[in-house]
Regions:
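RNA-binding accessory domains that recognize and position tRNA/RNA substrates
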Residues: 1-184, 194-240, 309, 357-362, ...
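Small/polar glycine-rich anion-binding or flexible loop at a beta-alpha turn
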Residues: 295, 343-351
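Structural beta-sheet core signal
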Residues: 185, 209-211, 244, 289, ...
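A short alpha-helix-loop-beta-strand transition element characteristic
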Residues: 335-343
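Conserved G/P- and acidic residue-centered "switch" motifs that form tight phosphate/ATP-binding loops
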Residues: 190
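Active-site adenylate/phosphate-handling loop in enzymes that bind or generate adenylated species
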Residues: 133-135, 168, 173-180, 251-252, ...
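A conserved beta-strand->alpha-helix junction
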Residues: 230-256, 346
Length: 394
């Protein structure tokens, strides 16, 4: 019975004169999301409302699933649109709506009328009362409950038509991707970084990604795991450019030249340097990591300060105060968890010291990095010049 979806947004409504930029971006993303499905949809914007209307038969569950992955959507409301053919016709159509939408009539309800068309000849209170009466007359087993109803029947009286809906499906929230700049995600095969990318994309940021590969110490299966995680993030964030950096020579050279308790922090600093270079090439305005304070030795406050010192771009860490279980729950929600726990090691887990430093000194790290001489710069440039680019589609 539903061929139209009312799509609500939240934060976008708080924008000022540039609100149309966010609305247009959201309309575009909704259109792109539905275009991949069977069935033709038109997506329109009208007076603070966005409508997606089907021109032919479609899979209802597929549509809901697709829309729940579009950032910027606060709620999805399957609805019917009625022509304004008079008050008696509205009463008859409401009874028809309830009859089709709710086969089991044992429920409590409330009618909630929004009179956007101020010229409508009846007040909201009158419509609430009169529609409630016809529902009770038609279906005596129903009951009115204005405080905690099972069904909230929304009636929007607009200038050209009347919208009726009672199901409100939560959307992902956030802002439309692409309305808030571009940033580079340091993506590994773990649980955290895909979640970090998801969360920053939710704030409207276009995501690119960099993965550090260390063959033969990391396998092609480890690389494919990261590609699969990028695909999962792309379902929400849209297309992602994935840079695959061969980090083997850099990693081995650091391992040979530097104290082993500092390996992780020094390797991390060079990863940040390379990611920043790639970010600047593509006009990214920041880096994104999945770090959370105290989770591992390289994520203590002292370690993060030393890592940050190597960057000129801002580093966004959306998981910084999260417990691991909170991160896992988001990973499961975006269907990344089962892939993240596949047992293929990445370069961050192979060259790990038994007793890594947890309170590194920036001066000490600087002195130890001097041992790497000019050769490390050559290795970095080679890694940047030989990057493999994989374009990930949603």
């Amino acid at each position: 019975m539903f061929h139209t979806f009312l799509i609500k947004y939240a934060e976008i409504g708080l924008k000022g004169k540039n609100r149309y930029v966010f609305e247009d971006a959201l309309v575009s993303h909704i259109h792109h999301s539905l275009k991949r499905l069977d069935g033709k949809f038109t997506v329109t914007k009208e007076a603070g409302r966005i409508y997606a209307t089907a021109a032919e038969e479609f899979d209802y569950d597929e549509v809901i699933d697709a829309l729940k992955k579009v950032f910027g959507i606060a709620a999805i409301c399957p609805m019917v649109q009625l022509e304004d053919n008079g008050y008696d016709d509205l009463k008859a159509k409401i009874v028809e709506y309830v009859d089709k939408a709710y086969p089991d009539k044992h429920f409590t309800f409330k009618v909630n009328t929004r009179r956007a068309n101020k010229q409508y000849p009846h007040t909201s209170e009158e419509v609430n009362r009169d529609l409630g009466e016809v529902i009770l007359d038609a279906f005596p087993e129903t009951k009115v409950d204005v405080h905690n109803p099972d069904v909230l029947l929304n009636v929007e009286l607009r200038a050209k038509r009347i919208n009726v809906y009672s199901l409100v499906i939560p959307g992902p929230g956030g802002m439309p991707v692409g309305t808030n700049g571009r940033a580079m995600l340091l993506l590994s095969g773990g649980i955290d970084s895909p979640v970090a990318g998801y969360m920053i994309a939710k704030r409207g940021v276009t995501i690119e990604a960099t993965y550090f590969h260390a063959p033969p110490y990391t396998s092609d299966r480890a690389k494919q795991k990261v590609v699969d995680l990028a695909k999962q993030v792309a379902k929400y964030a849209g297309p992602i450019k994935l840079n695959v950096v061969n980090f083997t020579d850099i990693q081995l050279y650091i391992y040979e030249q530097c104290p082993h308790e500092e390996l992780t922090i020094i390797m991390r600093r060079y990863m940040m340097k390379i990611a920043e270079e790639l970010a600047k090439k593509d006009d990214c305005l920041g880096l994104i990591t999945g770090e959370s304070i105290g989770q591992v030795a390289s994520q203590t406050v002292h370690s993060l300060a030393v890592t940050n010192a190597v960057c000129t771009l801002p580093v966004f860490r959306p998981l910084i105060g999260f417990d691991k279980q909170e991160i896992v729950e988001i990973s499961e929600k975006i269907d990344a968890y089962e892939t993240s726990i596949l047992p293929f090691e990445d370069c961050c887990t192979i060259f790990v010291a038994k007793h890594p430093v947890t309170k590194p000194s920036l001066n000490v790290i600087h002195n130890d990095e001097k041992k790497l001489s000019e050769k490390i710069d050559e290795l970095m440039q080679k890694a940047i010049d030989t990057v493999e680019v994989i374009h990930i589609e949603a």
